[in-house]
UniProtKB/Swiss-Prot annotation:
Heterooligomer composed of large and small subunits. Pfam families: Exonuc_VII_S (PF02609). This is Exodeoxyribonuclease 7 small subunit. Keywords: Cytoplasm, Exonuclease, Hydrolase, Nuclease. Bidirectionally degrades single-stranded DNA into large acid-insoluble oligonucleotides, which are then degraded further into small acid-soluble oligonucleotides. Belongs to the XseB family. The keyword Hydrolase applies. It is an enzyme of class 3 (hydrolase). It comes from Neisseria gonorrhoeae (strain ATCC 700825 / FA 1090).
Length: 74
């Protein structure tokens, strides 16, 4: 993401929920477009984080002796 990269999956999810609530009310077209774009970026961020965790869990399933590293590779 360009502007405010979330610090965590939970932060991104919380922001997505906030954007969704805002967009359900009255919102000027330009603001709605900006919110949609930000939401799109947040969804991609969350999908990436979930895919990373899923890969790490597959390693555990394949061989329970491997260490689970939840630290970001970024």
């Amino acid at each position: 993401m360009k502007k405010n990269t979330p610090k965590s999956f939970e932060e991104a999810l919380s922001r997505l929920e906030s954007l969704t609530q805002s967009m359900q009310g009255e919102m000027p077209l330009e603001d709605a477009l900006a919110a949609y774009q930000e939401g799109n970026e947040l969804v991609r961020y969350c999908q990436t984080k979930l895919a990373q965790v899923e890969q790490k869990l597959q390693v555990l399933d394949a061989d329970g002796t491997k260490e689970l590293n939840l630290e970001s590779d970024e």
